[in-house]
Amino acid sequence: IQAHSAGILLHQGVYYWYGEDKTLGNFNRTGIAVYSSKDLYNWKREGVALAKDSVPEQFRESGVCERAKVLYNSRTRKFVMWMHLDDKPYAVASAGVAIADKPAGPFRFLSYSRPVKFDFGYPEKDRTNQRELGNTYREMNLFIDSDGRAYAFYASEDNWTMYIVRLNAEFTGPEMPRAEGKTWARILVRQMREAPAPFKHNGKYFLITSGCTGWKPNRAGYA
């Protein structure tokens, strides 16, 4: 299965597994592949949900298109994909958004941006230019609550702090106007956590994260 950094969506009794297709190499020159299953054991390749050549040129070839996650918006009846987009030096660090009419796509790329611009004490030397462009967006996940509201969890501030951002009604961007503590929040401040996995169980919210050690293993943490 070529679907790295996977995100799984359950829709009408079918599981859809989205992830990076690295058949042509580590830089994911193909795009985001999707597989389907009814039992989480037998998987069928449905094709490429988001082709790499459909994202802006700087993210093709040696650029980064990863961590794709998909939600179904029952209001718009659209499938919405969020992903981490970056250049090879990991300096662009932005969120990409695409939509589709069907879970297997094809997804149409909409835009990329950094959802929050907040002065956390910008470093004097910052290769990601957060002061001008907004705070970085890297390893991420999506979460939809029981009330239908959706949220993006992601590593920001050059991976030092994690953000939670409530999405708009269409799930295609942050809820506006942005207000810290109301529509978005800083969590795990200065703890360098990434790969967030949020879920809700018995009325409580849980978040599992990884430390930022690259490909080296580390202990998972939970909150």
Stretches found by the model and what they are:
Residues I1-A223:
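Carbohydrate-active catalytic/glycan-binding domains of CAZyme proteins
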